[in-house]
From Swiss-Prot:
This is Flagellar hook-associated protein 2. Changing residue 264 to I: In strain: 212. Keywords: Bacterial flagellum, Coiled coil, Periplasm. It is found in: Periplasmic flagellum; Periplasm. Homopentamer. GO terms for cellular component: bacterial-type flagellum filament cap; bacterial-type flagellum hook; periplasmic flagellum. Required for the morphogenesis and for the elongation of the flagellar filament by facilitating polymerization of the flagellin monomers at the tip of growing filament. Forms a capping structure, which prevents flagellin subunits (transported through the central channel of the flagellum) from leaking out without polymerization at the distal end. It comes from Borreliella burgdorferi (strain ATCC 35210 / DSM 4680 / CIP 102532 / B31) (Borrelia burgdorferi). One of its GO terms (biological process) is bacterial-type flagellum-dependent cell motility. Belongs to the FliD family.
């Protein structure tokens, strides 16, 4: 602030600069003092904000440990071969291990056409019907193959997709139909004009793969005195030592996958089946010489009311397949005394001509029904020619039990665990559901680190250290993890809140929570140092720093081998009401939440600083204004003095000149 006042030759003589500074000294001191107070308030607020952030972080970690999503409540799913099987866990999963073999993964129907030139093929017009399981997709074609693909994709969203893929440089393409649903119940069936189109471009074969032989005709044509057959209740009865022959029609295509399935049962000769009917005679009635006789009453009890038979089985080689090259007797079949469905592979011989079913027992009667020869890969009797994959269920052995599912994502085998099948393998895969040891360790390390940072900030702002000649602080220097900027801020905050009893009481409370014993299932495991967390009570400065330290080996072993007690040490439900009542994390959260919550103690302190800083800024501005006013007044007075001195000097010179002239007269 320049005075603008200078008297040549008199500045030093009258000390006008010193006079000016002396006159403004008290006003300048008020500005400096109020500004320092403002800086101090802003630094104190910054210190409280830093403490608030550190405490909030520690409180959040305490809340995380006691929440439903606590790593103590979550399990980790680990597979011994993630290329075959992976697993993910949800809340509520248990610590368990299972052994699985993935025999087959679930797949969907993907059918390709033969090569064709889209420009030369004629697309049938009309209704194209596609079934994916029970979902029907109806598309009307106008003869344009590109529009057909577009309509299939629009109407088949989530169920069916179609595309045309260029297959060579000669302009040929292949039509691809892909079911978007896995599982054998979601077979892709093509009907309507779509069936004609599929046959035309080589998606489906012209030949059929399935047929149902007429059992009554077989009985009529093949029964004899030496081959006693009968047709009763839609079933073909093979008496002892009888057989039937099922000829394969010429229009039926038999493949290596072809099977015969039928329902079969047996009963011993001379024994009738238990009757499901009750027959009784209600008698007659006579009235005035008129007599009425009643007919027998028949009550059909139905199958549910039949006298149940004890289920028994016999074994028999009863299926033989024949071709021009010879015949082959198929393996034993288990036959029950109640109807059960059996399937037998019949595709072992090429050019199959007939299938024989024989009753080789001389004291058993065999009954068969619902006979069908089929290819399991057929679609409504037609065989896909260029199938990339077929709709199949996933098949696994789960702890030795055969299991089928229609998806590779299985949620219902292990509670709250999802198994994801990747590929089949004959190797056994071990699926472990176990505590998330790494997740627990990570959060506990974060918790310990956050606790130490809270303690460090309290130690810094509460410090009573003297720093003569800018001597370094032991409290700050022992915090080796601080960056240069953080260390600079720490020195600014050193001792700034040393009069705050709240922080001293908080430190004492935190240490009490951390180091006191807690109730766990193991009376020999109740304090934190038993899991490898301890404190070196004396800091490098000779004070009580009480920072937490780790015995890493003991810490890791406790988490890995004693996880239940570690959990109880941090969060414990005393009465089984699923609400945590005790433990380090629980008690720490209860202590810290009221401090940092909106309206809490520290929150309000920071808010109060906003008002103090606002008022102090006004005070600084007020002192500056008063200083400027005072400065202008002083400058005015000194300028007046300057003018007076100049006039006096001029008068002095005038008088000297007058005196000189008088003497020279």
């Amino acid at each position: 602030m320049a005075s603008g006042f200078f008297v040549p030759g008199l500045e030093s003589k009258y000390n006008t600069k010193e006079i000016r500074e002396s006159m403004l000294k008290s006003d300048k001191a008020k500005i400096d003092s109020s500004f320092k107070k403002l800086e101090s308030l802003e630094q104190e607020k910054s210190a409280w904000q830093l403490i608030n952030r550190k405490i909030s972080t520690l409180n959040s970690l305490a809340k995380e440990l006691t929440s439903l999503n606590s790593p103590f409540n979550l399990m980790s799913g680990n597979s011994s071969n993630s290329e075959v099987l992976t697993l993910s866990t949800r809340y509520g999963s248990k610590n368990e291990t299972h052994k699985l073999i993935v025999d087959q993964i679930a797949s969907a129907d993907v059918f390709l056409s033969s090569n064709f030139d889209p420009k030369k093929v004629t697309i049938p017009e009309g209704d194209y019907i596609f079934l994916v399981g029970k979902k029907e997709i109806n598309v009307k074609s106008n003869g344009n193959i590109d529009l057909l693909v577009k309509d299939i994709n629009n109407k088949g969203k989530g169920f069916l997709s179609a595309k045309i893929v260029k297959s060579d440089k000669n302009g040929n393409s292949r039509f691809v139909l892909q079911s978007l649903k896995e599982g054998k119940e979601n077979k892709l069936v093509i009907k309507g004009e779509g069936l004609s189109f599929a046959k035309q471009i080589g998606i489906l074969s012209e030949l059929k793969t399935n047929f149902n032989p007429n059992l009554s005709d077989i009985v009529v044509n093949q029964s004899s005195s030496n081959n006693k057959l009968a047709f009763e209740n839609n079933g073909l009865v093979l008496n002892p030592l009888s057989e039937v022959s099922i000829e394969i029609p010429e229009d039926i295509e038999i493949t290596s996958r072809s099977k015969i399935k039928f329902e079969v049962k047996y009963f011993d000769t001379g024994l009738e089946e238990p009757d499901s009917k009750i027959i009784f005679n209600p008698g007659g009635a006579t009235f005035k010489d008129a007599k009425v006789e009643s007919e027998d009453s028949v009550v059909d009890l139905g199958s549910d009311l039949k006298t149940p038979l004890e289920k028994k089985y016999i074994q028999m080689n009863m299926v033989k397949i024949c071709s021009k090259e010879g015949s082959l007797e198929l393996p034993l079949i288990n036959i029950s005394n109640n109807f059960e469905e059996v399937e037998v592979d019949v595709g072992a011989l090429s050019n199959l001509e007939e299938i024989n079913i024989e009753n080789k027992a001389n004291n058993k009667v065999i009954v068969i029904s619902n006979v069908e020869i089929f290819d399991p890969k057929n679609r409504d009797g037609h065989l896909p020619i260029n199938a990339k994959s077929f709709a199949e269920n996933a098949k696994i052995k789960f702890d030795g039990v055969d299991v089928e599912r229609d998806s590779n994502v299985i949620n219902d085998l292990v509670p709250n665990v999802t198994l994801s099948l990747k590929k089949p393998s004959s190797d056994m895969v071990e699926a472990k559901i176990e505590p998330d040891y790494e997740g627990i360790k990570r959060v506990l390390l974060d918790f310990i680190g956050a606790y130490n940072e809270v303690l460090a900030e309290i130690n810094i702002v509460s410090s009573n250290e003297d720093q003569p000649n800018n001597q370094k602080s032991n409290i700050v220097e022992e915090l080796t993890y601080l960056s240069d900027s953080q260390k600079e801020e720490a020195y600014k905050n050193l001792g700034i809140l040393r009069s705050e009893f709240l922080l001293k009481n908080l430190k004492s409370k935190l240490e009490s929570i951390i180091f006191k014993p807690y109730v766990t299932s193991d009376p020999n495991f109740s304090i934190i140092n038993q899991m490898g967390v301890f404190t070196n009570s004396i800091s490098s400065s000779g004070g009580l720093s009480r920072y937490l330290r780790l015995d890493e080996k003991k810490f890791d072993e406790s988490i890995r081998n004693n996880i239940d007690n570690v959990r109880e040490l941090f969060l414990y439900d005393l009465n089984g009401d699923r609400v945590y009542d005790n433990g380090i994390a629980k008690m720490l959260g209860d202590c810290l939440s009221p401090l940092v919550a909106s309206g809490g103690v520290i929150y309000n302190k920071i808010k109060n600083y906003d008002l103090k800083i606002f008022n102090q800024k006004n005070k600084v501005e007020d002192y500056k204004k008063k200083y400027e006013d005072r400065e202008r007044k002083v400058e005015g007075e000194l300028n007046t003095l300057d003018f007076t001195v100049k006039r006096m000097k001029d008068q002095e010179n005038t008088l000297k000149a007058f005196d000189f002239n008088q003497r020279n007269k």
